[in-house]
């Protein structure tokens, strides 16, 4: 699934020259313009399908909605706070980041902050520059034997843990996603948050800024902490409540804080920055030559690999699209879209609940990536959106009055005469169920409402299909249908029938293009519909 029409990319922030070179070597046109106003950014994007930014460019809803050609936004770094994800997703624009690019640099800065807090190195340096010699004022504390609480145990959190363990620190932590067994493998004991607060001598945060993490350290949690706790935030401004932190510093509950990020950057309120026990930097977490080179290289490689259909990594807002690049999953994504398109043509404008059912071991976890593809098939002809795709499908489906559920059946190979893996799409409470599978790399239709096709019907993007159901006992039906095709001037490209089910047979005809009307057909058959996905 290559983004074949992605041809031109705007780089709107300063990036390593390797980024431009990799993009150009991959066949993409590149424009580099920095310090653009919103209006200038919108103007530049009118001719670009791709945009690569760092943190300076703000990709707002206004920018996204005005950029008619934009398909992909790449963030050369981890956080995507400067990209309106909801607006991008709604418009079907893919958002990517480079989650590994600045991890080491951010981890090293965090470790440096911890050491500076322990020994007050920046304050002592400032004192020396003032011509003073204040040995007693800057009494520090050893890290050996102290407890470090790490909130967020992803790439950066675990790098911090392994480094600070070398200083003899005990590392405990919390992460709602990483299992205790995994964190134990890199030396971090996971505990509930309420047990972490009173144990820590130092606390460092490494979570994204979410509603659940905003103000994670606040007046209440500071009150539960050990008196004299030291806090580090090199993640995102807002995770630590800045007002609560200032109050904790003023009361002595917090002995020191090291901040690389702020709720507002640069901060207009200088109370924290100016506090004598606060060490601060102007958001330098990724500001190393190595990180900048790595992030620029990684985002460029991700763009080129995506365009060439090789792989898709670093996706922030479309798990299904990532799966669509897997050699195993790609044909199943195509099958899911085909069955969704079939279901819409068959059931009209379905309302209620669409059931997406997978069967077979290799599809055990595929429902969440196949259901968006089913939605694309259901909505692409009916949505008022210019483009329904795997990025925005789940966001748009509820607006269409549909609920989509997924379920899985671990059926044994050969059960019911089917292959090991199947995908079924059904309309709950209505007589509409289509079943398909993948043969080699070809999606095929296996059955409709229990009527099985032998052999299965290939589902190809270049072959419109006409489907109709008839009474099996009518010998005049085939010549009648051929006559209707002849009257319409349409050639028959393929023809298959199902096994008899409840005295009726399904017929599938491959035709060069969809017929203008099926009224003449419906006079001779039980039901008829056509589709092309």
UniProtKB/Swiss-Prot annotation:
Pfam families recorded: 2-Hacid_dh (PF00389), 2-Hacid_dh_C (PF02826), PGDH_inter (PF19304)
SUPFAM superfamilies: Formate/glycerate dehydrogenase catalytic domain-like, NAD(P)-binding Rossmann-fold domains, Serine metabolism enzymes domain
Keyword check for NAD: yes
Glycyl lysine isopeptide (Lys-Gly) (interchain with G-Cter in SUMO2) cross-link, renumbered residues: 21
Catalytic reaction list: (2R)-3-phosphoglycerate + NAD(+) = 3-phosphooxypyruvate + NADH + H(+); (R)-2-hydroxyglutarate + NAD(+) = 2-oxoglutarate + NADH + H(+); (S)-malate + NAD(+) = oxaloacetate + NADH + H(+)
Class of the enzyme per the UniProt entry, highest EC level: oxidoreductase
InterPro entries: ASB_dom_sf (IPR029009), D-isomer_2_OHA_DH_cat_dom (IPR006139), D-isomer_DH_CS (IPR029753), D-isomer_DH_CS1 (IPR029752), D-isomer_DH_NAD-bd (IPR006140), NAD(P)-bd_dom_sf (IPR036291), PGDH (IPR006236), PGDH_ASB_dom (IPR045626)
Positions of post-translational Phosphothreonine modification: 78
Protein keywords: Acetylation, Amino-acid biosynthesis, Isopeptide bond, NAD, Oxidoreductase, Phosphoprotein, Serine biosynthesis, Ubl conjugation
UniProt modified residues of type Phosphoserine: 14
Amino-acid positions noted as binding NAD(+) in the UniProt annotation, renumbered to this chain: 78, 155-156, 175, 207, 234-236, 260, 283-286
Alphabetized GO MF terms: L-malate dehydrogenase (NAD+) activity; NAD binding; phosphoglycerate dehydrogenase activity
Active site residues according to the UniProt entry: 236, 265, 283 (proton donor)
Chain coiled-coil ranges: none
Organism superkingdom: Eukaryota
Cross-link Glycyl lysine isopeptide (Lys-Gly) (interchain with G-Cter in SUMO1): residue positions: 21
Entry-annotated residues carrying N-acetylalanine: 2
Residues annotated with N6-acetyllysine modification: 21, 58
Biological process according to GO: L-serine biosynthetic process
The enzyme's E.C. designation: 1.1.1.95, 1.1.1.399, 1.1.1.37
Family classification: Belongs to the D-isomer specific 2-hydroxyacid dehydrogenase family.
Quaternary structure and partners: Homotetramer.
Function recorded in the entry: Catalyzes the reversible oxidation of 3-phospho-D-glycerate to 3-phosphonooxypyruvate, the first step of the phosphorylated L-serine biosynthesis pathway. Also catalyzes the reversible oxidation of 2-hydroxyglutarate to 2-oxoglutarate and the reversible oxidation of (S)-malate to oxaloacetate.
Name of the protein described by the UniProt record: D-3-phosphoglycerate dehydrogenase
Organism encoding this protein: Pan troglodytes
The encoding gene: PHGDH
């Amino acid at each position: 699934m290559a983004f074949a029409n992605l041809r031109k990319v705007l780089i709107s922030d300063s990036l390593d020259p390797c980024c431009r070179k990799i993009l150009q070597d991959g066949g993409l046109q590149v424009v580099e313009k920095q310090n653009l106003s919103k209006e200038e950014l919108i103007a530049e994007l009118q001719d670009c399908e791709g945009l690569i930014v760092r943190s300076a460019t703000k990709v707002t809803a206004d920018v996204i909605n005005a950029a008619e050609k934009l398909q992909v936004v790449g963030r050369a770094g981890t956080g995507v706070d400067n990209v309106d994800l909801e607006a991008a997703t709604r418009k079907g624009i893919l958002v990517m980041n480079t989650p590994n690019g600045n991890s080491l640099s951010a981890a090293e800065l965090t470790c440096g902050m911890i050491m500076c807090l322990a020994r007050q190195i920046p304050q002592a340096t400032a004192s020396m520059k003032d011509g003073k010699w204040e040995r007693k004022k800057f009494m520090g504390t050893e890290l050996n034997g102290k407890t470090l609480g790490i909130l967020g145990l992803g790439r950066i959190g675990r790098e911090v843990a392994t480094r600070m363990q070398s200083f003899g620190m005990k590392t405990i932590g919390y992460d709602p996603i990483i299992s205790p067994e995994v964190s134990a493998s890199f030396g971090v004991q996971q505990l509930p948050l309420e047990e972490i607060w009173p144990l820590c001598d130092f606390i460092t945060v490494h979570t994204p800024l979410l509603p659940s993490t905003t103000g994670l350290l606040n007046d209440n949690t500071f009150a539960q902490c050990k008196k004299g706790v030291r806090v580090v935030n090199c993640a995102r401004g807002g995770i630590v409540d800045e007002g609560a932190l200032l109050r904790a510093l003023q009361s002595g509950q917090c002995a020191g804080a090291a901040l690389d990020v702020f709720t507002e950057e640069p901060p207009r309120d200088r109370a924290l920055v100016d506090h004598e026990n606060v060490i601060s930097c102007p958001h330098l977490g990724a500001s190393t030559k190595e990180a900048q080179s790595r992030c620029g290289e990684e985002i460029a490689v991700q763009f080129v690999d995506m365009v060439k259909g090789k792989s898709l990594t670093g996706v922030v807002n479309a798990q299904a699209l990532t799966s669509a690049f897997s050699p195993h999953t790609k044909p199943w994504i195509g099958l899911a879209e085909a069955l969704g398109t079939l279901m819409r043509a068959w059931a009209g404008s379905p309302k209620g609940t669409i059931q997406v059912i997978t069967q077979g071991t290799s599809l055990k976890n595929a429902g969440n990536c196949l259901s968006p593809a089913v939605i694309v098939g259901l909505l692409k002809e009916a949505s008022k959106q210019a483009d329904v795709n795997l990025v925005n499908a789940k966001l748009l489906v509820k607006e269409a009055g549909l609920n989509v559920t997924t379920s899985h059946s671990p059926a044994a190979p050969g059960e019911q005469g089917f292959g090991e893996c199947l995908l079924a799409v059904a309309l709950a409470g209505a007589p509409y169920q289509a079943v398909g599978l993948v043969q080699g790399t070809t999606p095929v239709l296996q059955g409709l409402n229990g009527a099985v096709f032998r052999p299965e019907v290939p589902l190809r993007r270049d072959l419109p299909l006409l489907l109709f159901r008839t009474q099996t006992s009518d010998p005049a039906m085939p010549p009648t249908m051929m006559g209707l095709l002849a009257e319409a001037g349409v050639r028959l490209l393929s023809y298959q029938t199902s096994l008899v089910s409840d005295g009726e047979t399904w017929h599938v005809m491959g035709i060069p293009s969809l017929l203008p009307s099926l009224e003449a057909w419906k006079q001779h058959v039980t039901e008829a519909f056509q589709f092309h996905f």
